[in-house]
């Protein structure tokens, strides 16, 4: 019953927020539910780590497009950790220092060859055959919303996982 409740909450959030504005706090709450569902599905094959601040400082609850974290975690599972039978790991980290919030989603999966990563970036985050559309949509929506306040970088090496790293600078009045 608990999994059914989490699944329905996640679906409702996705339907309500895919084209709307949400908040960082809502994104964190929903990725927590998504992780619980994936833990049941994957068992001990993949470990999830959610790092949210250092416990000392409150992270600003900034407005942001909805459904940002879930597609990135889904990409990690589908592309990086698809064949993993044990010791897979997905780390979602949200930190803040002064007026800069950093968000990263990384995995320890198969990664990408440097030339494939370069091709992904040069082709506007889309691969031939239409793969990585979730990554494309997330990056486009973030760039449209935050404009020059956000920097997004991708890091990967074959056999060494994949990371999407975002740095959001808040305007302080």
Task: Give each language-model segment a name.
Residues 1-153, 162-165:
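Two-component histidine phosphotransfer core
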């Amino acid at each position: 019953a608990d999994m059914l409740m989490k699944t329905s909450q996640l679906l409702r959030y996705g339907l309500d927020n895919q084209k709307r504005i949400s908040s960082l706090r809502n994104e964190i709450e929903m990725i927590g539910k998504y992780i619980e569902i994936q833990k049941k599905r994957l068992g001990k094959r993949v470990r999830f780590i959610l790092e949210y601040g250092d416990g000392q400082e409150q992270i600003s609850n900034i407005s942001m497009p909805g459904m940002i974290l879930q597609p990135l975690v889904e990409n990690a599972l589908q592309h990086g950790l698809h064949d993993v039978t044990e010791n897979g790991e997905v780390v979602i980290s949200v930190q803040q220092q002064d007026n800069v919030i950093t968000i990263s989603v990384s995995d320890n999966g198969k990664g990408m060859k440097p030339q494939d990563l370069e091709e992904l970036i040069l082709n506007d985050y889309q691969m031939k055959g239409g793969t990585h559309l979730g990554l494309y949509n997330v990056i486009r929506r973030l760039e449209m919303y935050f404009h020059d306040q956000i920097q997004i970088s991708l890091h990967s090496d074959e056999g060494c996982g994949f990371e999407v790293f975002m740095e959001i600078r808040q305007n302080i009045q």
